[in-house]
Amino acid sequence: MAEINSLTELSVVTNTAETHENIAPVHVQKLDSQGRAYATGKRKDAVARVWIKPGSGKITINNKEFDKYFARPVLRMILRQPIVATNRDTQFDIIATVAGGGLSGQAGAVRHGISKALTYYEPELRTILKKGGFLTRDSRVVERKKYGKAKARRSFQFSKR
């Protein structure tokens, strides 16, 4: 870095620094060679790898239809939230592989992955998804068990006599 010798040189440097701060980050479309957007989603111990591509609205999870993989309607609703919020129900085919955790964590991980992949495919959807809270990683995990306790917080039964 060059040394600054006068106030005019200092003002030039500070003015350029201020303009860089005011510029909003430009989000560009991120696609692979096959025209798909890829993202990973996480929730609890589950990790989902999600690809989206233009299609008819078919959702495949671990090579199964999503309503076969997630039998409970609540889990299917969780998974479809970002697609419904952006009105892209029938525009994209979604392929996901998910591992780890239970079904609830896996549904949350796929939802997170779908949201991120949608922003990579259509960056203008970012504001809708951000407002809905779909792009935020849910960091809540199981609290660890402590020694001297029955569970994380539950104490052993206390007997006075």
UniProtKB/Swiss-Prot annotation:
Organism of origin: Bartonella henselae (strain ATCC 49882 / DSM 28221 / CCUG 30454 / Houston 1) (Rochalimaea henselae)
GO biological process: translation
Gene symbol of the encoding locus: rpsI
Signal peptide: none
Superkingdom, taxonomy of origin: Bacteria
Annotated GO CC locations: cytosolic small ribosomal subunit
Disulfide cross-links: none
UniProt-recorded name of the protein: Small ribosomal subunit protein uS9
Family: Belongs to the universal ribosomal protein uS9 family.
Any one GO molecular function term: RNA binding
HAMAP family in the record: Ribosomal_uS9_B (MF_00532_B)
Record keywords: Ribonucleoprotein, Ribosomal protein
